[in-house]
Amino acid sequence: MAHEILIAETEAFLKNVAPETRTAIISAITGGKSACKSAAKLIKNEHLPLMSGEATTMHIVMRCLYPEIKPWKKASDMLNKATSSLKKSEGRDIRKQMKAAGDFLGVESMMKMRAFRDDQIMEMVEEVYDHPDDYTPDIRIGTITAWLRCKNKKSERYRSNVSESGRTALKIHEVRKASTAMNEIAGITGLGEEALSLQRQTESLAILCNHTFGSNIMRPHLEKAIKGVEGRVGEMGRMAMKWLVVIIYFSITSQPASACNLKTCLKLFNNTDAVTVHCFNENQGYMLTLASLGLGIITMLYLLVKIIIELVNGFVLGRWERWCGDIKTTIMPEIDSMEKDIALSRERLDLGEDAPDETDNSPIPFSNDGIFEI
């Protein structure tokens, strides 16, 4: 039963793929070990017209069916990145539950009962992909089938469940709210031009999101654009905090000076009454000194805590390697992969819905041991 559900969910996942490509992949999955290994090699060498996400997903499915297929670095990196925020204790607990689940129904119930987050589900997928021999075929097939079902449900426009495109729209809405708040702060902090630029960017993203709603094609590129805008919002927030420090000093120094000090200042600078001159009195000097000491102590404590956290993340949790990978990805992005995805998406849009569906809908044969055969 799990095999048949896997085929159905795989076909649903590949619904935007060209019919001949979808048929070739399904035939390979149902054609036994050798056919699956050949298809996995074609996917790894990018000889099939698949998006980056589609290719890695299909390779994961094939390796979980047949552990003899060697892991693909691109798929492993994707899984590592998806589970990087997961705690080790959560990972251990998930592995125990997986081994006790037994089959597809148990795995699916486990995901639903525990209301697993995306990173927890990806931890399960990573386990059966990295260590397939540690789990029974039922658990491996059940895990990837339940994972595909989750992906397919999120890609559809359900009213009860927010789709991935809907989540993207919500993120853009949050960014727009943040940019509006920054625009209001701009009156005090002098960030008006930056706030207006940010608002224009978020409006453009909102329009783009509306055009691509319900589509899996451009979502990764939208996510990257949103992260860029979120980074701008964060930077503007930090600038606003710096202006807050200036405002604290200004609130201290803006107290009325005594008549004696004002006269002294006017005599010293030989100014007329038309020029406003501020001289610090003794109380204001004490307040400025205390404010400077307080801000200095807070800054030093913050830096000390930050250094300790970074050391723990680096030496104990081993996150430095992942950060280096993220920096490398930012500095040297996969331009070729992005261009390939965009070109393929245009080709699919040009093809339209009039293309004949050549999917082989004949009954799927099985051997006595439950393995697919032609």
Curated annotation (Swiss-Prot):
Modified residues (Phosphoserine): 337, 362
InterPro entries for the chain: CM1 (IPR004271), CM2 (IPR004267)
Molecular function in Gene Ontology: channel activity; structural constituent of virion
Processing and modification events after translation: Palmitoylated. N-glycosylated.
One of the record's GO cellular component terms: viral capsid
Pfam families: CM1, CM2
Family affiliation: Belongs to the influenza C protein M1 family.
Protein name: Polyprotein p42
Originating species: Influenza C virus (strain C/Hyogo/1/1983)
